[in-house]
Amino acid sequence: MKRFLSLGAIALAAAALTGCGLLEEDSTDAESEVSGDQVDAAAEAASGDCLPQEVLSEDPDVFTIDCSDPEAYWSITAIDGDTDATAAAGDLTDYQPAFDLCGEEVGAFLPGKPLTDWNMIYDQVSGEVDYLFCVEAIAEPDEEGRTAVVPAAGDCFSSADATWSTVPCDSELADYSVADVVELELTEHAAADLEAAATECGETVYYELTDLFGRTSALLCVE
């Protein structure tokens, strides 16, 4: 039976930053299909193991990669091969198993904190989830100085990036700096409430830190 990798929360939520999704129109199942060897290797995966940014390695024989590999982007924080979770159309039918395994803040954009996400290996036909796992971005800058950490006050970022990260403020990539952060309860907020909170930013531009689940953790007041 074929197994597939979920599209993942971070990939879908990235549209909030750029206005366009990471998923190309010509994406195919082949791009997320997990080989039999990778499924077997996932059985040996454990907290602290690393994965590439795309989660699925190009090498069909391995699931995790060496954490010293320049391609290492995610660190596994938890993995469960005995879950009652089910999937449909590349997504969990109920997110509660992900919250139970990864914590309620998984996928949330929290200022000053590394990106987090969940993912799964599942059977596209039966919907059975073989492995559900949680990941946290490795907070180390890449060759361009980009670090997979949500910007906080004093940080700079590029609005052209596919998802939240920080860049050095003297980098040519930086086009915004965070002047202030308006912290909010991590939940869904009505538009009127967000507009009211945004008055704390004064006349400056602001960004909403809203995740896949519709929860907004804060507003970034930028200049």
Q: What do the predicted segments below correspond to?
A:
Residues 1-9:
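Bacterial N-terminal signal peptides that target proteins for export
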Residues 21-223:
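Primary mode marks residue(s) on the alpha4-beta5-alpha5 output face of response regulator receiver
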Residues 16-19:
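C-terminal motif of bacterial Sec signal peptides marking the signal peptidase cleavage site
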Residues 10-14:
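Hydrophobic helical h-region of N-terminal Sec-dependent signal peptides
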